[in-house]
Curated annotation (Swiss-Prot):
GO terms for cellular component: cytosolic large ribosomal subunit. The lineage of its organism: Bacteria, Pseudomonadati, Pseudomonadota, Gammaproteobacteria, Lysobacterales. It comes from the Bacteria. Forms part of the ribosomal stalk which helps the ribosome interact with GTP-bound translation factors. This is Large ribosomal subunit protein uL11. The keyword RNA-binding applies. It comes from Stenotrophomonas maltophilia (strain K279a).
């Protein structure tokens, strides 16, 4: 018989830096899950990623207090800010531009995000990422 799913927990945790402090501890503690077990498993799963990049994770909690988790790719906005060398997006993206990204940078981000995007091909994925860049106040070159 399959385990009964109690709930899903969505978090953003920095790669390789999961620890029992908030937001991880309280979120898992509410469901009675083993916090240290998750931290060790998550840190092992994200050790190949650049330390400190936020990684979205979806944790499935079961009735017998076990869990499974799926990691997603780093959010596009974080990758765009890193590529443009800025700390935050524009408060008024239509009038106030805060940085520039090239088509090549957008292609690299699209390749990294490809498993999580619903785009049909690389060009469509690049257009999606370019739209995110423009909505942050970045100028897309190329």
């Amino acid at each position: 018989m399959a385990k009964k799913v109690v709930g899903y927990i969505k978090l953003q945790v920095k790669a390789g830096q999961a620890n029992p402090s908030p937001p991880v501890g309280p979120a898992l503690g509410q469901r009675g899950l083993n916090i240290m077990e998750f931290c060790k498993a998550f840190n092992a799963a994200t050790q190949k990623l650049e330390p400190g990049l936020p990684v979205p994770v979806i944790i499935t909690a079961y009735s017998d207090r076990t869990f499974t988790f799926i990691t997603k790719s780093t959010p596009a906005t974080t990758l765009l800010k890193k590529a443009a060398g800025i700390s935050s997006g524009s408060k008024r993206p239509n009038t106030e531009k805060v940085g520039k990204v090239t088509r090549k940078q957008l292609e690299e981000i699209a390749k990294a995000k490809e498993p999580d995007l619903t785009a049909a091909d690389l060009d469509a994925a690049v257009r999606t990422i370019a739209g995110s860049a423009r909505s942050m106040g970045l100028v897309v070159e190329g």
